[in-house]
Amino acid sequence: TFAYQVVVDFARARNRIFTGGMAIDLALKSKGSFLYDKYNIDFDFLSPDFHRDAFDLTDLLGQDLEKDRLNAIVAMHPSTMRVRYNFQAIADITYTPHELFDLIPTIEANGCRIVHPCYQMIDQHLALSMPYANEPLINLGGRYKKDFIRQLKLMRAFPPAKYVKE
């Protein structure tokens, strides 16, 4: 879809780091597997300049989408901006200071810079080991199953022991 390509091109041009479900999907596709079987326009990426990125992405999308249906808002966490169209999330852009942003291990998949799958597994492990961390904001059963499936797929495609530095 249009929004999908705009977000991908925007993040590529600014060398932003995809994380979350889209990063997992891109990593798995590089190994012949997948998480999503269709376009998923719910992107998550990291940025040292998240406010500017959110408003710039909103302006860019507004060139072809109805501007009165687009907005950039503060998401659930104050360090994340959400770009929405018709009240549906298109992108969550999370602040990461330059000093940390440059240290995050990444790989390239389909021309996108994504969090290294083994690093992403840390987030998955955290979600699985602390299922009540965001309670009551989440559906525990659905979220837990989703994270468990993601963790298994990542571990099969990217066995952690293969990527240990000595």
Where do the model's predicted regions map?
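Hydrophobic alpha-helical interaction segments
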Residues: 1, 124-166
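Active-site nucleotide-donor binding segment shared across nucleotidyl transfer reactions
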Residues: 2-51
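Non-catalytic helical "accessory" subdomain of NTase-fold nucleotidyltransferases
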Residues: 7, 13-17, 88-89, 96, ...
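Short, low-complexity, polar/charged sequence segments that are solvent-exposed and flexible
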Residues: 15, 35-39, 64-67, 110-113
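Short, conserved charged micro-motifs
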Residues: 51-58
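Conserved catalytic core of two-metal-ion nucleotidyltransferases
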Residues: 59-102
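Phosphate-handling catalytic interfaces
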Residues: 101-137, 141
